[in-house]
Regions:
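Surface-exposed amphipathic alpha-helical tracts and adjacent flexible/coil segments at the periphery
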Residues: 1-148
Length: 148
């Protein structure tokens, strides 16, 4: 298979992505006696957590970009997030100047951004600055420690 530009895919680069998917540990199920799906681990295994999805990105000065993203799992000021994008490979993205963007309501039609240290409101919008240009739809994730 070829990717854009006629270059062959390097499948070894994609191999780690298979391990990053959240799933229950594999087991023998009913094959050997009582059914046990995951005797050693309770719950799912994952090496990455979906932190946010990019909704917009615009220039914010020389070498800086302002990102608007919808939060799915907690991330913090200073965290380094991995960006998964159908476009060019993007290195780690460091979160700077994190702010919560409250939704308008009956009391405040144009609420001001609120500087925060932690993005912890699931499905809410946040803004931050970074040195990398992102695109709407880019998936931001963070690596987590998983014992196996």
């Amino acid at each position: 298979k070829m990717k854009e530009g006629g270059l062959p895919y390097n499948y070894s680069e994609l191999a780690d992505e298979l391990l990053a998917v959240s799933h229950r540990p594999y087991g023998t199920g009913f094959y050997y006696g009582d059914a046990r799906q995951s005797p050693d681990v309770d719950g799912y295994t994952a090496e990455c957590r979906h932190a946010a999805t990019v909704e917009a990105c615009e220039p914010a000065g020389e070498g800086a970009f302002r990102v608007i993203a919808r939060c799915y799992n907690r991330f913090c000021e200073g965290d380094e997030l991995e960006a998964l994008s159908p476009g060019p490979h993007i290195p780690l993205v460091r979160v700077r100047n994190l702010a919560w963007l409250p939704a308008p309501d009956g009391d405040d039609a144009q609420p001001k951004r609120v500087p925060v240290a932690v993005a912890n409101r699931s499905a809410e919008r946040y803004a931050f600055e970074t040195g990398e240009e992102l695109a709407p739809g880019d998936f931001l994730r963070m690596r987590i420690n998983v014992e196996r």
